[in-house]
Design a protein with these regions (language model features):
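Extracytoplasmic/lumenal domain signature
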Residues: 1, 34-74, 81-89, 101-149, ...
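Solenoidal tandem-repeat scaffolds enriched in leucines and small polar residues
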Residues: 1-9
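Short, solvent-exposed loop/turn segments at the edges of secondary structure
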Residues: 6, 15, 43-44, 73-75, ...
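Structural signature of WD-repeat beta-propeller blades
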Residues: 9, 76, 160, 245-246
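Long, low-complexity segments enriched in small/aliphatic residues
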Residues: 12, 145-148, 154-180
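Conserved beta-strand position repeated across blades of beta-propeller domains
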Residues: 12, 79, 163, 249-250
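Short coil/turn segments that connect the beta-strands within blades of beta-propeller domains
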Residues: 16-18, 90-91, 168-169, 253-254
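Residue position within the beta-strands of beta-propeller blades
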Residues: 22, 95, 173, 257-258
Length: 266
């Protein structure tokens, strides 16, 4: 048994369509095998959902990570914007959730306009634009053996706010790459009042082999990514010493501000 799907961050109001749009969290336990023997998509986990603001009636949804298995929430910040795409003005929403893909959706219908990874993703190669589903790699669900993965449960982007500048047309994402090893917990039993992950978290510990540990440590990165949502590519990035940096502020004077875990204000 299981559940999850908490709405703990982004909730926005779209006054044009009189919609409340919110991002939905991960599955609990993380490992879908402990939630759903049928191995379904588990709606509405890891989804963006729109409801009528006046009645609460469901309008549409888009699921970023069907059958979530990795703690890949879609609760990260939802931004509303007007973008010119293929010569047409579109009223869109944008999100860079934990799973490492940057999404642009039509905010009236939920239609997927674009999706592309903004960091390295080992769990999925790309998003199928016909179905909107990520194309998972063979080892992604760690069904037979533990799987090395990027992003980790920390996410490619977490609760630290991204920002959008209409002046530059860029979205500024406090992104990170933190490797993780997912594997089944063969002794998992649900325990009320505890984190019920259903994965063996000890697999993610740093190995005793110092050479391997140093190699893994070198893979841990934090950066500002300036993302162009129209061309679907990175415009530039700024490297940080490590991950878990603060939210972004962009100004009309084309300045960027951000705090770091080391107490610096940039």
């Amino acid at each position: 048994d299981g559940g999850g799907g908490t709405v703990w961050d982004s909730i926005v109001y779209d006054e044009v369509n009189d919609s409340v749009i919110f991002g939905v969290g991960n599955g609990s336990p993380w490992n879908r095998d402990h939630r759903d023997a049928g191995k379904g998509d588990n709606l509405f986990l890891s989804s963006i959902v729109a409801v009528d603001a006046s009645t609460g009636t469901y309008k549409w949804h888009f699921q970023t990570t069907p059958g979530d298995n990795w703690d890949y929430t879609a609760t990260q910040h939802i931004m509303l914007a007007d973008l010119t795409i293929d010569g047409a003005k579109r009223k869109v929403l944008m999100q860079a959730p934990k799973n490492g893909f940057f999404y642009v959706l039509d905010r009236q219908t939920g239609e997927l306009i674009s999706a592309r990874n903004f960091v390295q993703t080992t769990w999925a190669s790309h998003v199928d634009m016909e179905t909107g589903r990520p194309v998972e790699t063979p080892q992604a669900r760690f069904a037979e053996a533990p799987s090395f993965a990027l992003p980790s449960p920390f996410g490619a982007h977490n609760w630290h706010s991204m920002s959008y500048s209409p002046e530059t047309g860029l979205v500024y994402i406090p992104a990170q790459e933190v490797p993780f090893v997912y594997g089944k917990d063969p002794e998992f039993k649900y325990a009320p009042g505890y984190w019920n992950l259903g994965v063996d978290a000890s697999l993610a510990a740093m190995p005793e082999d110092q050479a391997v540990a140093q190699q893994l440590a070198a893979m841990i990165k934090g950066r500002i990514i300036a993302w162009n949502p129209v061309t679907r590519e990175e415009a530039f990035h700024v490297e940080h010493p490590g991950p878990w940096n603060g939210g972004m502020l962009s100004t009309a004077g084309n300045l960027l501000f951000q705090g770091t875990p080391l107490g610096q204000f940039l």
